[in-house]
UniProtKB/Swiss-Prot annotation:
The lineage of its organism: Eukaryota, Viridiplantae, Streptophyta, Embryophyta, Tracheophyta. Coiled coil: none annotated. This is EP1-like glycoprotein 1. Residues 43-163 form the Bulb-type lectin domain. GO terms for molecular function: carbohydrate binding.
Length: 455
């Protein structure tokens, strides 16, 4: 027994030492300086960018490249870009390392003997790292699919960018319930920090949320689809026979288990069914090899896919899927389609609701500021104006609200809630929906669907 314990302890010690001793060889180590100077070609967000240069490391695997970029002065993000400099349509940023914690001029990206990839300021303050020190990392690589990896001596990934998505999924990249389970939008093109829109995978489905008021509101997604814990963005040939011409399909694939019928009983804003039975959702079909594609949650809350056709002489990028479109879910269902506020019908912003009625819409149309009208339980009157035949963007995903209840009770709830900008009432079903955010109001042919907006 003592001999067995001794052998076990010895084996564990040898294993531990072997991991600690597995180090990055000198010829694969690097330290890159974020030096002043900019590259000349156009890129997404109208960003300025800088190349990374090291005699020990290539940061470019066509068409993906690791670079620094900035949209505001002295605030740089380490990011992966897709596209080549000859592209007439601009190259795209598909992964950010430190978008919530940018660095300044002369910051450094270092990959030392211990295998930790570290982004630090000139004074040594660490702004981002992979936390892979002494975990057996022996090399750095950017793969042809856009996955940036740190691997051990056997080629096994110790860390990979595919496990840390920001607002974008590349082909083969996943969201996982037991891992990073969401995409988060940028705040704007100029501000790359986390924005108000997210797409979250849980055991109920893949759901899109907007949170501008402290209350997450559902506005899209596949809320009743069982992805079995994992959803992967994929592009596959329509036909398996490689000798025959084939279209390519953009898919959202669940974990590879026996398929179940996802059901679909509340898709009130949907123009056509999205996806098919069997668990896999078919987003679109394209007539070329779309292996280089990505799915992006935009700063405006949109969900779009873009595909890259490198054989084209210009305009290599094409929008190949849009969740809010004439073909899928109505454009009016996007909360920001009419900006901060507006009345939408058939993909057009046709009016600006006011207490005096519908006025001509412009990008200056804004909801009323109502906090001063909140009664707060003190009996102060709250005024509303009425809009007939309209629904809220979140209505289809919350079964039009709570009920049955009376319109007076619905009003009383909104009166008492300072965050409530208005309420939507379904007269036929006696359903009540309180709205802390208005955004785009959607025309409803059913005149029993009525909105009451505070002013």
């Amino acid at each position: 027994m003592l001999r067995f314990d001794y052998l076990l302890i010895t084996a564990l010690a040898i294993s531990t030492v072997s991991v600690v001793m597995a180090q990055v060889p000198p010829e694969k180590q690097f330290r890159v300086l974020n030096e002043p100077g900019y590259a000349p070609y156009i890129t997404e967000y109208d960003a300025s960018y800088r190349f990374l240069n090291s005699p020990n490391q290539n940061f470019f695997t066509i068409p993906f490249q690791l670079m620094f970029y900035n949209t505001t002065p002295s605030a740089y993000v380490l990011a992966l870009r897709v596209g080549t400099r000859r592209d007439m349509s601009f190259t795209r940023w598909i992964w950010d390392a430190n978008r919530n914690n940018p660095v300044g001029d002369n910051s450094t990206l270092s990959f030392g003997r211990n295998g930790n990839l570290v982004l630090a300021e000139l004074n040594g303050q660490v702004k981002w790292q992979t936390n892979t020190a002494n975990k057996g990392v022996t090399g750095f690589q950017i793969l042809p699919n856009g996955n940036m990896v740190l691997h051990d001596k056997h080629g096994k990934f110790v860390w990979q960018s595919f496990d840390h998505p920001t607002d974008t999924l590349l082909v083969g990249q996943s969201l996982k319930v037991n891992g990073v389970n969401k995409l988060v939008s940028r705040t704007s093109d100029m501000n790359g920090s986390d924005g108000p829109y997210s797409m979250v995978l849980d055991n109920k489905g893949l759901t899109m949320y907007v949170n501008k008021t402290g209350t997450p509101l559902v506005y899209g997604g596949w809320t009743d689809h069982d992805f079995r814990g994992t959803v992967t963005f994929a592009v596959t040939r329509e036909f398996d026979n490689l000798t025959e011409p084939s279209a390519y399909e953009l898919l959202l694939e669940p974990a590879p288990q026996p398929a179940t019928n996802p059901g679909n009983n509340r898709r009130l804003l949907q123009v056509r069914p999205i996806g098919s039975g069997g668990g896999t959702l078919n987003l679109n079909k394209i007539n070329y090899n779309g292996t280089i594609s990505y799915l992006r949650l935009g700063s405006d809350g949109s969900l779009k896919a873009f595909s890259y056709f490198p054989a084209a002489t210009y305009l290599e990028w094409e929008e190949t899927f849009a969740f809010f479109s004439n073909y899928f879910v109505r454009q009016c269902g996007l909360p920001t389609f009419c900006g901060d506020y507006g009345y939408c019908d058939r993909g057009m912003c046709v009016g600006c609701p006011t207490p005096k009625g519908l006025l001509a819409w412009s990008d200056k149309c804004a909801p009323p500021k109502t906090t001063q009208f909140c009664s707060g339980g003190k009996g102060k009157a709250v005024n509303y104006y009425k809009i007939v035949g309209v629904e809220h963007f979140t209505g289809p995903y919350v079964n039009d609200g709570q009920g049955p209840t009376s319109v007076n009770d619905c009003k009383a709830k909104c009166d008492r809630d300072c965050k409530c900008l208005g309420y939507f009432y379904k007269e036929k079903d006696k359903k009540c929906l309180l709205a802390p955010l208005l955004g785009t109001l959607i025309k409803d042919a059913n005149t029993s669907s009525v909105a009451y907006i505070k002013y």
